[in-house]
Structure formats: structure tokens, C-alpha cells
């Protein structure tokens, strides 16, 4: 999603214009795509598939594999689960005055297992020489926009755990709202996000509990 910047139209398709990145992280995403395209265009004997992730969240349903950020998490779900379990005192919600139904930012949250499956399909497509172009691009998202406050409420409902959160000022570089149009990936790759948001949030919480059980966090 970072390659699109602040989109003009929603949901975002692969043909949406690439705008100036709103953060250094977004800029690296755009640069990485340019490097891949330039490498293929140079005549290198390779093809490529660019998967444009939206917001991966969750963990493997067995709770044996998940996200373990170093230090203070830079994305929402680890910070949320660490707050829920008591590692962090409070979760900060950056802004409630955006032009969205509840004022908080909207994102397309995709289960990390669904995302991993998209990689398997993409690799098979390259190896089996099924690509229609030397470089193909696919949005990997659910097609559903969920606000930060909706996500918090969804976590509380899915787990029965109340979150201590506070509204703070906007964070520089945050995009107001963005979610994918995944139709091209659905139709061309035969891939579609399967996991519900509720199950994804439960998996994230189960992973955090497993970390506590192992004495890691």
C-alpha cells in the first residue's frame, strides 16, 4: 500500500498512480519496485512479480509462528497485544479527526497466513512460466477498509480483553485511508484472502499468550 501514497480513488487498483511517498518507509517500497523493474528491463534473464502488501497482521493459527519485533513495535498489532497483556501501559491511537466515519485512519488488514499463500502462488507462477508479462504487479489485500478504532473494538470482541487506549495527535506520514482492490490477484492468481478479521485478531492474541508462556515477553 505504501507505494500508492495518499490515493485519489478507493479501493486502490494496481493501475493507480504512484505518488510521492509520505514516509521514508514508503519511499523504500517505491525504490525497491524501481530496482526490480530496472533489473528486468536491463535484459537480465529473470522475470518478477511485485506483491503489494497492505497491512499484514496476525500469526499462524497454531501460535507456533508469529511476529516478534525488537524494542518498541512500529506497527499496530504487536503494540496492541503487548498493551492487552500488560507489557505496555497504554495504546496510542494517532488522530481521531480524519475524514473517516470514526475519525481514525483506515487500513486493509490482511492475515499473514493469507499473505504467505500469495507468495507460494506467485513463486509457482514464475517457475511454471505462466506470467503474461516479465514484471507483474498484484495487490495483496482483503478489499475491506477497517479503521483503527474498529480494529480495537474487534480485538476486544474477539478476545474478551479490554484495551487501555488513548487518542493522541496525528502522526506525521500517516495516510488517512487506503484499502486494496484485490480483484486482479483474485482472478489472475486464483488467490483470495480467506481468514476473517476476528480469527486473525484471535491468532495474534494467541501468539502473544504463547510468548508469555515461553518467557519471551
Briefly describe each language-model feature range.
Residues 8-9, 60-65, 105-106, 151:
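Short aromatic-enriched loop/helix-cap "lid" or pocket-rim segments at secondary-structure transitions
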Residues 4-5, 10-11, 60, 87, ...:
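A short secondary-structure junction motif
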